[in-house]
């Protein structure tokens, strides 16, 4: 028996204010909450920070232009992205070069651990990954620590105001 949704995509999108930080699930737009993203596009919600593995796709599987969260980037509704991979969305690089989009790239495991650290209430994560790379220049890097002769980067937790996950079917 079909139940009425607890919340429609439009109602969910209206809960997200300008300037919010949103964590988005999925990989190459699979698993992203595309219905809510479409509603955010309609509402024109702006100055968003997106945290995701990637920034969606420049072209969708049915030929759609700017698939998933890439549509928010295309519409200049995003001011900052925190991701592990942005290569499938060339507009990210273009807007970053133009100075209209801040891009913070983190290794995939580091991003996952920094998200986990926030959820666990930890003050940070030590990782040997990213030493002497642009990761060390990230706003999430608090510096190096040496423990038992080995160097680590101390990374801040990554926090979001909202998390959007795509689902075909879910419970309350």
Model-derived features: where do they sit?
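Conserved alpha/beta enzyme-core scaffold
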Residues: 1-172
């Amino acid at each position: 028996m079909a139940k009425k949704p607890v919340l429609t995509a439009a109602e969910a999108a209206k809960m997200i204010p300008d300037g919010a930080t949103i964590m988005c699930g999925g990989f190459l737009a699979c698993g992203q909450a595309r219905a809510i993203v479409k509603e955010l596009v309609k509402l024109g919600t702006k100055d968003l920070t997106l945290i995701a593995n990637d920034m969606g796709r420049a072209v969708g599987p049915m030929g759609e232009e700017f698939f998933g969260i890439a549509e928010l980037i295309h519409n200049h509704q995003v001011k900052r992205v925190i991701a592990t991979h942005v290569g499938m969305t060339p507009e990210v690089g273009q807007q970053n070069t133009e100075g209209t989009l801040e891009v913070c790239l983190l290794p995939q495991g580091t991003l996952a651990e920094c998200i986990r650290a926030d959820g666990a209430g930890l003050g940070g994560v030590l990782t040997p990954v990213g030493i002497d790379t642009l990761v060390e220049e990230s706003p999430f890097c608090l510096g190096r620590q040496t423990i038992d002769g080995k160097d680590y980067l101390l990374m801040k937790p990554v926090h979001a105001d909202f998390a959007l996950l795509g689902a075909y079917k879910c419970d309350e």
